[in-house]
Amino acid sequence: MSRKTYEKIANINGMFNMLEQQIIHSQDMAHFRSDFFYVNHEHRENYEALLIYYKNSIDNPIVDGACYILALPEIFNSVDVFKSELPFSWVYDENGITETMKSLSIPLQYLVAAALEVTDVNIFKPSGFTMGMNNWNIAQMRIFWQYTAIIRKEAL
C-alpha cells in the first residue's frame, strides 16, 4: 500500500475509535453531542432545537438519529419540520415520495432513505444505503457514521 493509503486507513480507524468512545460515554448527553460531527454550526443548532421539539428523542435513539439528519441545513431549510409528527413524516405520503424529498440533493436523498431503512421503510431500489455507499463523499460518509453512533448509543 502506498503511504497515502496508510494515512487514509489511519484516519478512518481514528474516526471509528472516536465514534466508539461516543457510544461508550453516551450517558453524558451534553458531552456526547459536543463531540458529534456537524457540517457547520447551523447543523448543531438545528439539531438541538429538534431534540427539544421531538421530546421522544430522549428515549428513542431512532428519533434522535433522525433529528440529527433532519438538522442538516439543506434539509432543515427545505422542510416545515415543526409541522411533522415524526422527523421523517415529510418524506413520503399516500402518493409516494414527496416533492420536498425529490428537491434534496441526490446524496441527501440516499442519506434519508438509508436512515428510513433502519425502521424497515424502503423507498428506493437499490437501497439508499447501497446507493449512498457508492456515491457519498467523505463528509456525507461522516454524517452517516455519526448517525449510526447515535442510533446505537445503547449498544455497549
Predicted regions and their residues:
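Extended, charge-biased low-complexity segments
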Residues: M1-P107, D120-L156
